[in-house]
Design a protein with these regions (language model features):
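PP2C/PPM-type serine/threonine phosphatase catalytic domain
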Residues: 1-250
Length: 250
């Protein structure tokens, strides 16, 4: 996660499931450098978010030229960006880290769920197993291997990785600032409290953010996951996913 007074960025690195990536640096390195380069690329408010992302992707690629960036498992991440620009809010989402806007008593979730339509049978196979079991681990590796072949392709889904052309496939838009009370940019490890676990509503989420802040919200996620540590009630890839949230007020 990275932020300035006018910009909030959440990046969520994709799991390698223990498989090779063709990169000696790893996903945490990639996410950290992409965040820094994205902040730099968007320093000028008139730079479009998609152009800024493309520029950042190119810059990071140049930082590790000896790595195999064409490897389908090269380090990659989801991207969610919210920017205040004059009297509008610009947004960009690439993959499933959402931005949620609180607007006049309602909530608008901006997200890119193309990944959810990829290989549904293999996804279901993973979810048949409890986490931390050999069957789950093996099914997840098979799923990730197959998923990688569709990553950043017309028949699959798009993420930030070695090819800057992925930025052109991000979902973008703008909302008048006066229509939005506040907003949250988050990883899907947080949004699943609403979308998958269904133990809270967006109204609940924003009530927590307004009164107790992001730390309390993330603890709510962890407390919920602790009631189902092996994914029996809520089948998933891991017991607890990375959780990050930037709460935005103006």
């Amino acid at each position: 996660m990275a932020a300035t007074p006018s910009l909030a960025i959440v990046l969520d690195g994709l799991s390698t499931a223990g498989l090779s990536t063709g990169c000696s640096h790893g996903v945490p390195w990639y996410v950290a450098h992409l965040g820094g380069q994205l902040l730099a690329s968007l320093a000028e408010p008139d730079q479009s978010l998609s152009e800024g992302l493309a520029d950042a992707l190119e810059r990071v690629a140049h930082l590790h030229p000896r790595c195999d960036l064409k490897n389908p498992g090269t380090p990659s991440a989801t991207v969610a960006v919210l920017r205040r620009r004059y009297e509008v809010l610009d947004h960009l989402v690439l993959a499933d880290s959402p931005i949620v806007l609180a607007t006049n008593g309602d909530f608008t979730a901006l997200t890119d769920l193309r990944v959810d339509s990829v290989l549904p049978e293999m996804r279901a196979e993973v979810e048949q197993h409890e986490t931390h079991t050999p069957g789950h681990r093996e099914a997840l590796q098979r799923f990730v291997l197959a998923q990688r072949q569709l990553r950043n392709t017309a028949d699959g889904y798009w993420v930030a990785a070695g090819d800057s052309r992925a930025a052109a496939h991000a979902q973008t838009g703008s909302t008048p600032l006066k229509e939005v009370r506040d907003a949250a940019v988050m990883s899907d490890g947080v949004s699943r409290l609403v979308t998958e676990y269904q133990t809270a509503t967006w109204d609940d989420v924003f009530t927590t953010l307004r009164s107790e802040g992001p730390r309390r919200l993330i603890q709510d996620v962890r407390d919920t996951e602790a009631t189902d540590p092996t994914g029996r009630r809520w089948p998933r890839y891991k017991s607890g996913d990375d959780a990050a949230v930037a709460y935005c007020q103006w």
